[in-house]
Regions:
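Metal- or metallocofactor-binding catalytic centers and their adjacent structured scaffolds
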Residues: 1-37
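Flexible, glycine/charged-enriched surface loops at secondary-structure junctions
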Residues: 2-6, 41-45, 137-143, 218-219
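A generic structural signal for well-ordered alpha-helical segments
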Residues: 34-35, 156, 207, 233
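N-terminal small/glycine-rich loop or linker at the start of catalytic domains
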Residues: 36-61, 96
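Active-site beta->alpha loop and helix N-cap motifs at the rims of alpha/beta catalytic domains
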Residues: 40, 57-69, 73, 90-94
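Gly-rich Lys/Arg/Thr-decorated short loops/hinges at beta-loop-alpha junctions or inter-strand turns
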Residues: 50-55, 74-81
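Catalytic core of soluble alpha/beta enzymes
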Residues: 84-225
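Flexible C-terminal active-site loop/helix
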Residues: 219-245
């Protein structure tokens, strides 16, 4: 029975340990069938909060001139938010980010994807330097290793720029721990990490309870899973940031 979602999802998540991407594929198919059976788009069934969402455009870590070219092209294409990837060279990261800010101007929102590249102390030093130089980054994603929650909290407590937990969160329990310990300011939800929409909705409920905003992102995925993420983003008011390109 397609309307017995809880039972279906309990069986799905009990069927195998880990493998969240495989679970997500089944989860999304179930929710798609659920919505089609009701004759409504999925985002309306899940909450229907928004008619429009705005995604950031990812700028991959490359030589400075290539990152500048990609950033300017994204702005020319109409993107108002850039998600800029960092590397493993602190001075080069600072140089690249400041060069991009200067090139695109103050009207473009810039988010920093640190991708676990820095130590806690290095992260504080880099982010503080960027703050002092007027970078005005909207946020920094996962500045330290996913398992280093003590380090994540250290960074969050020592900088002004909001810190996002990404790879540190796979489940509602992970999100609850991060929020209760104030280890990060924001939560990044990815359906390939959570095992699909069902667990992502639980994370949204926790975030809403504590008044914490969420971002929704993606990995290297098909348009099917990215579309599912877009529906979830449109459904929930707690998802205030989108990074699906």
């Amino acid at each position: 029975e397609i309307f017995d979602l809880d039972t279906i999802m309990q069986r799905l998540h009990a069927s195998i340990v880990n493998n969240p991407s495989a679970k997500a594929a089944v989860d999304m198919a179930v929710y798609d069938l659920y919505a089609k059976t009701l004759g409504q788009p999925l985002y309306k069934i899940l909450g229907g909060a928004k008619q429009k969402i705005e995604t950031a455009h990812t700028i991959s870590a490359k030589p400075t001139d290539e990152m500048l070219r990609d950033s300017l092209q994204a702005v020319q294409d109409g993107f108002g938010i850039l998600n800029v990837s960092a590397g493993k060279q602190a001075l080069k990261d600072v140089e690249n980010l400041l060069a991009i800010r200067k090139a695109v101007g103050p009207g473009i929102r810039i988010r920093i994807e640190a991708d676990q590249c820095w130590s806690p102390q290095e992260a504080v030093r880099i982010i503080s330097t960027l703050e002092d130089k007027g970078m005005q980054a909207e946020l920094v994603e996962q500045p330290v290793k996913a398992h280093d929650l003590t380090g994540l909290k250290f960074v969050t407590q020592h900088v002004q720029t909001p810190i996002v937990a990404d790879e540190s969160i796979f489940s509602m329990k992970d999100a609850l721990h991060i929020i209760q310990t104030q280890s990060a300011d924001l939560i990044n939800i990815k359906l390939m990490k959570t095992g699909g929409i069902h667990e992502a909705l639980k994370i949204c409920t926790v975030a809403e309870t504590y008044g914490v905003d969420c971002m929704i992102g993606c990995m290297l995925e098909s348009k099917i899973s990215v579309s599912a993420a877009a529906h979830l983003a449109a459904a929930k008011n707690c998802i205030t940031m989108v990074d699906l390109i």
